[in-house]
Amino acid sequence: MDYTLTRIDPNGENDRYPLQKQEIVTDPLEQEVNKNVFMGKLNDMVNWGRKNSIWPYNFGLSCCYVEMVTSFTAVHDVARFGAEVLRASPRQADLMVVAGTCFTKMAPVIQRLYDQMLEPKWVISMGACANSGGMYDIYSVVQGVDKFIPVDVYIPGCPPRPEAYMQALMLLQESIGKERRPLSWVVGDQGVYRANMQSERERKRGERIAVTNLRTPDEI
């Protein structure tokens, strides 16, 4: 290997070669350990496995379910998020996706299936009908599935696009990564800590207010 030295500016005060800088050499063993050993908390590792291996339980009630199934095609490839394994039994699933209109007669069935799911479990409400009843403001339609089961992520739209469903999966993965659950038996008041996730509306509020040049419909 050839080494070359560069002089300092000859017009300067010092015409000597520059002195070499002293560098701290790290231990080679420490470098190899950092490359081959995963450092972290057990809770974070468990959450990492949970959020990347979600098993959804498809509970399609209306047209929103068609958009959900579309996300499983090769065009969208929901397998990138580890949520392509649909389960026909709630006992083998940890995510319930309520897609469509929830009627009053269907609410007890959804409640029973949700109770049959083992912990940890999450719920995604997909579409305007599942969120708030949609345009069916009548006695036979439940005005939102959150009236009888807890909902983690809401997907707006009538019906929402497959991209919206995949964004909901990413938001759910982010929420799962911040959860804190007991790793053993639950004693006393120990429960599940869920981070207070900011809604997309609030998160994008500042960005939308800052917009000055609005695009025409032809430019969108």
Swiss-Prot record:
It catalyses: a quinone + NADH + 5 H(+)(in) = a quinol + NAD(+) + 4 H(+)(out). One of its GO terms (biological process) is respiratory electron transport chain. [4Fe-4S] cluster binds at residues 63-64, 129, 158. InterPro entries: NADH_UbQ_OxRdtase-like_20kDa, NADH_UQ_OxRdtase_20Kd_su. Its cofactor is [4Fe-4S] cluster. Binds 1 [4Fe-4S] cluster. Keywords: 4Fe-4S, Cell inner membrane, Cell membrane, Iron, Iron-sulfur, Membrane, Metal-binding, NAD, Quinone, Translocase, Transport, Ubiquinone. Its main location: membrane. GO terms for cellular component: membrane; NADH dehydrogenase complex; plasma membrane; respiratory chain complex I. One of its GO terms (molecular function) is NADH dehydrogenase (ubiquinone) activity. The keyword Ligase does not apply. SUPFAM superfamilies: HydA/Nqo6-like. It is an enzyme of class 7 (translocase). It comes from the Bacteria. It is a peripheral membrane protein. Its EC number is 7.1.1.-. It is found in: Cell inner membrane. NDH-1 is composed of 13 different subunits. Subunits NuoB, CD, E, F, and G constitute the peripheral sector of the complex. Belongs to the complex I 20 kDa subunit family. NDH-1 shuttles electrons from NADH, via FMN and iron-sulfur (Fe-S) centers, to quinones in the respiratory chain. The immediate electron acceptor for the enzyme in this species is ubiquinone. Couples the redox reaction to proton translocation (for every two electrons transferred, four hydrogen ions are translocated across the cytoplasmic membrane), and thus conserves the redox energy in a proton gradient. This is NADH-quinone oxidoreductase subunit B. It comes from Escherichia coli (strain K12).
